């Protein structure tokens, strides 16, 4: 194991177990020195020879166009000479990089293990997750980046005004393929730069960017993975992310990097080229798992995505959709919608973790997670309620039916659980179970005033919508296209 005082002299250094995989025993003394210089000086230098413990980002269709990359990184000084691919010097350089992914057996036949690289200027990279790909036979979940509306609503099939308003808002605001391309381009560039200090690290895109519930104005969630396993967030994550933040300050395409020391620490930053806001966490792989669980729910029934999008817009307008300010995160809101749709007398959606347990196994290798639900068929519900009726029913459920003081929302079980089952949950205002690690996703709501504001929004919006049947009375047109509010930095 690497002696911590040698490489990491920081007072708040990481736990020793974390970096034994970053710098293995077979790394030479010279390579350790290079890694140390990369992390303490200007983060510049050739990658050390370390085994690829975290395989290359594999969530890309097989058909990939090659992307040329300049030999100089974004911080390069342009003094390196250009070298032919077949030169002796280049062959020598390859011996000091991670093993080629082509020497590894494919983990999934539908995804390639080719890395995505980035040009220095302009960053015009073809988004690998948006390349053309066919649907897997029998599966309801489209390939990553698929732009067509599978089983989409026909505008003429929607009769009532409220449903039409919801559908119009959905089509106007849903994330487009070019939005995803911008996020993927920054992800690929960032992974290349982070590998200068953590050669075997991978950066994964997740959250609403991939789960089917993103809008054109959605931020992007990134997960930095160095080794898969439990992390001491107070020590390991904060330390690693502090190194990453120092790196981001030196990258010309990144603006305003800020370390947020939350229960799950993140680095917030902005991509100068696309203007997209990013949240980067460290080793929070449960976020990758729930991304593809939610993606399956998004496409298993055609009414789910429009309903979730309008509810997120509504919650943002009423200032109850910001965990950093003590209200509900977007993830919690999505789980609340799914729970409501699961627990209707005639469910609109199934309970995926109960019906397809092997597809969402919490122990599944993280690189197989995207293909887990690939063969799950579309759900045919007997409940044919309109979008308008479902939205009104959602507001009614949380305004008058759900018992906040006694019940826990569980999408994993497709029912409510009693708070008394868990002593840690008894004094929480809102309890929403995370489907994989079973923590409370609504833990940010810890002030009674914020809790009462959330309940009041449901009660008043339900009253108005029941009376008017018009979306504009609870979500004005001027706010429907607004970017989600975020806490000031």
From Swiss-Prot:
Residues 386-440 form the PAP-associated domain. Its main location: cytoplasm. GO terms for molecular function: ATP binding; metal ion binding; poly(A) RNA polymerase activity. Mg(2+) binds at residues 219, 221. Keywords: ATP-binding, Cytoplasm, Magnesium, Manganese, Metal-binding, mRNA processing, Nucleotide-binding, Transferase. It is an enzyme of class 2 (transferase). It catalyses: RNA(n) + ATP = RNA(n)-3'-adenine ribonucleotide + diphosphate. Residues 100-116 have a biased composition (Polar residues). It holds the Pfam family PAP_assoc. Its cofactor is Mg(2+); Mn(2+). SUPFAM superfamilies: Nucleotidyltransferase (SSF81301), PAP/OAS1 substrate-binding domain (SSF81631). The keyword Nucleotide-binding applies. Residues 93-118 are annotated as: Disordered. It is found in: Cytoplasm. Its EC number is 2.7.7.19. Cytoplasmic poly(A) RNA polymerase that adds successive AMP monomers to the 3'-end of specific RNAs, forming a poly(A) tail. In contrast to the canonical nuclear poly(A) RNA polymerase, it only adds poly(A) to selected cytoplasmic mRNAs. May not play a role in replication-dependent histone mRNA degradation. This is Poly(A) RNA polymerase GLD2. The gene is tent2.
């Amino acid at each position: 194991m690497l002696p911590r005082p040698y490489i990491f002299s920081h007072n708040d250094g990481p736990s020793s177990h974390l970096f034994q995989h970053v710098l293995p025993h077979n790394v030479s003394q010279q390579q350790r020195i290079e890694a140390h210089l990369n992390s303490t000086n200007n983060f510049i230098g050739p990658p050390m020879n370390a085994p690829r413990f975290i395989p290359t980002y594999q969530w890309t269709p097989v058909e990939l166009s090659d992307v040329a990359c300049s030999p100089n990184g974004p911080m390069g000084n342009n003094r390196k000479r250009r070298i032919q691919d077949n030169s002796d010097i280049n062959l020598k350089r390859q011996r000091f990089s991670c093993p080629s992914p082509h020497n590894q057996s494919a983990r999934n036949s539908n995804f390639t293990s080719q890395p995505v690289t980035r040009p220095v200027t302009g960053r015009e990279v073809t988004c690998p997750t948006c390349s053309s790909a066919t649907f897997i036979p029998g599966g309801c979940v489209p390939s990553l980046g698929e732009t067509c509306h599978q089983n989409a609503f026909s505008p003429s099939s929607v009769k009532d005004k409220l449903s039409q308003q919801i559908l119009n808002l959905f089509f106007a605001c849903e994330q487009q393929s070019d939005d995803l391309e911008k996020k993927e381009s920054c992800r690929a560039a960032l992974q290349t730069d982070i590998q200068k200090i953590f050669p075997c690290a991978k950066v994964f895109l997740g959250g609403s960017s991939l789960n089917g519930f993103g809008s054109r104005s959605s931020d992007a969630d990134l997960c930095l993975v160095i080794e898969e396993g439990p992390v001491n967030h107070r020590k390991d994550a904060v330390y690693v992310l502090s190194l990453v933040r120092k790196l981001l300050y030196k990258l010309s395409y990144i603006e305003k990097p800020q370390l947020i020391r939350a229960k799950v620490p993140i680095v917030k930053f902005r991509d100068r080229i696309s203007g997209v806001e990013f949240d980067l966490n460290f080793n929070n792989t449960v976020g990758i798992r729930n991304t593809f669980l939610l993606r399956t729910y998004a496409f298993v029934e055609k009414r789910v995505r429009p309903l979730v999008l309008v509810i997120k817009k509504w919650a943002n307008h009423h200032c109850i959709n910001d965990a950093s300010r003590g209200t509900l995160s977007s993830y919690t809101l999505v789980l609340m919608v799914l729970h409501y749709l699961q627990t209707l007398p005639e469910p609109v959606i199934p309970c995926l973790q109960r019906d397809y347990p092997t597809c969402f196994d919490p122990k599944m290798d993280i690189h197989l997670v995207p293909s887990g639900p690939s063969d799950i068929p579309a759900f045919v519900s007997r409940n044919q309620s309109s979008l308008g009726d479902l939205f009104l029913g959602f507001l009614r459920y949380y305004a008058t039916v759900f018992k906040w003081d006694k019940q826990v929302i569980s999408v994993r079980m497709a029912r409510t659980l009693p708070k008394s089952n868990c002593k840690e949950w008894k004094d929480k205002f809102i309890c929403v179970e995370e489907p994989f690690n079973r923590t409370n996703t609504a833990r940010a709501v810890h002030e009674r005033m914020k809790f009462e504001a959330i309940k009041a929004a449901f009660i008043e919006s339900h009253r108005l919508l029941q009376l008017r049947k018009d979306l504009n009375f609870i979500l004005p047109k001027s706010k429907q296209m607004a970017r989600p509010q975020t806490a000031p930095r």
